Each structure stands twice: as structure tokens, then as C-alpha cells.
Amino acid sequence: MTTESLETLVEQLSGLTVLELSQLKKLLEEKWDVTAAAPVVAVAGAAAAGDAPASAEPTEFAVILEDVPSDKKIGVLKVVREVTGLALKEAKEMTEGLPKTVKEKTSKSDAEDTVKKLQEAGAKAVAKGL
């Protein structure tokens, strides 16, 4: 591929929504028969010696939508649209086939606010540190 075509590809990928990126990830995993799970690495040196804190507080969080009762879908759908800026169709898809990541790489306070809004609408949602 030429540099120009790679730049075009990067521009196209940059324009995708979170939902579209999630779908792309699934398609690539199926096509290449791989998973996007991070490898587990055993770290013995510095952590065992006490040079690093045992558990550092994460600075980035992901908001995971785990469950939406059928009688609460419309309210949750409105909140998903509000917090993500997705169109109606994409937001509806986000509330189906759970769990789904609603937001990624967001601050702790933003993640907590988003979880609170989703829970107030009737959904089961959690914030997980990245």
C-alpha cells in the first residue's frame, strides 16, 4: 500500500463510531481467527521488590452496559444517545446483545456520571478501570 492509501485508511477508521469500531473488531477477529485480548504477562522484578505500588489507581475507565430490562429500553436508549452522541439506530444496537462498551478511555468522574445516568434509567452498568 502507498503512504497515501494508508493515510486514507486512517482517516476512514478515525471517522468510525464506537459501535462501528466494535463491529470491525469482531469481523477482524473472525476473519483472522484471533482474539483481541491482551496477553497476560507475569511481572516479578520491580513489583515483587516493592519499587512500584501494588495496585495503581487507573486513570482511564470504560463504561460497560450489562443489562437493560425490556420495560426500560426507551429510557436507556435516550441516555445512550445523550452520552455517546450516536444516532437512534446505532444507540438501539448498543442496547441489544449485551454487554457492550458505551464509553472507552474516559475519566473516572465522567464514567461514574455515565453509570449513574444509565442506572437511573433502569440499566445495569459498571465502570471498569483500563
Swiss-Prot record:
Please give the InterPro entries that the UniProt record associates with this protein: Ribosomal_bL12 (IPR000206), Ribosomal_bL12_C (IPR013823), Ribosomal_bL12_C/ClpS-like (IPR014719), Ribosomal_bL12_oligo (IPR008932), Ribosomal_bL12_oligo_N_sf (IPR036235)
Q: Which GO terms describe its cellular component?
A: cytosolic large ribosomal subunit
Molecular function as annotated in GO: mRNA binding; structural constituent of ribosome
Q: Is the keyword Ribosomal protein in the record?
A: yes
**Gene3D superfamilies in alphabetical order:** 3.30.1390.10, Single helix bin
Primary role: Forms part of the ribosomal stalk which helps the ribosome interact with GTP-bound translation factors. Is thus essential for accurate translation.
**What subunit structure does UniProt give?**
Homodimer. Part of the ribosomal stalk of the 50S ribosomal subunit. Forms a multimeric L10(L12)X complex, where L10 forms an elongated spine to which 2 to 4 L12 dimers bind in a sequential fashion. Binds GTP-bound translation factors.
* SUPFAM superfamilies for this protein: ClpS-like, Ribosomal protein L7/12, oligomerisation (N-terminal) domain
- Member of which family? Belongs to the bacterial ribosomal protein bL12 family.
Please, one GO biological process term?
Answer: translation
Keywords linked to the UniProt accession = Ribonucleoprotein, Ribosomal protein
How is this protein named in the record? Large ribosomal subunit protein bL12
